[in-house]
Amino acid sequence: MNTIDWEFMISAFPTLIQALPITLFMAIAAMIFAIIGGLILALITKNKIPVLHQLSKLYISFFRGVPTLVQLFLIYYGLPQLFPEMSKMTALTAAIIGLSLKNAAYLAEIFRAALNSVDDGQLEACLSVGMTKFQAYRRIILPQAIRNAIPATGNTFIGLLKETSLAFTLGVMEMFAQGKMYASGNLKYFETYLAVAIVYWVLTIIYSILQDLFERAMSKPYRT
């Protein structure tokens, strides 16, 4: 029976780390756009804006119902067929767009639930003292909703971080693609993919710790 080459596995880490910036850039950029998109969708559905409300529900249903890999292929290979000017779009850009659109749909539901968790009476109270609806949301409603949405939003980011590994199918040289090439060159598949798994695991642990610290900081003003 073959044994695990631990020395080789350890030697794979420096190679994998070289692609870590691409992985993190993809995840962070996609999350920023997803948060913006998700918040807009949540506000539309919360306020039931005519036409936009129906379109947002359709958007959420589509991107939650279609596999992420199919979405990436539709964007990278399909859109240039309909819009030739998009043929210059890079694989990295397509991956960020795809991951942003998909996660915006999930975050929209998270943010909508967070907004609904804030008592409607607070909005009425803000309006009664002369605040505009925009001021009420910015100063009172959104800060509370954001606090309520942090745990689920953090879980979404962890999922997004792992989904960046799908970008290798478009040709993006992120961490999983780097590991795949390294394994093919040395025929040490188990050791290499185990090293890849450990890096992703460590990243999620680090992020979970940071999220926990952030949650505590956000909860401090509400403690009695």
Curated annotation (Swiss-Prot):
Compartments (UniProt record): Cell membrane
Per the UniProt entry, the disulfide pairs are none
Keywords linked to the UniProt accession: Amino-acid transport, Cell membrane, Membrane, Transmembrane, Transmembrane helix, Transport
**Induction text:** More strongly expressed in the presence of methionine than in the presence of sulfate.
Q: Which residues form a coiled coil?
A: none
Instruction: Give TM regions.
Output: 3-23, 24-44, 58-78, 91-111, 157-177, 190-210
Please state what the protein is called.
Answer: Probable amino-acid permease protein YxeN
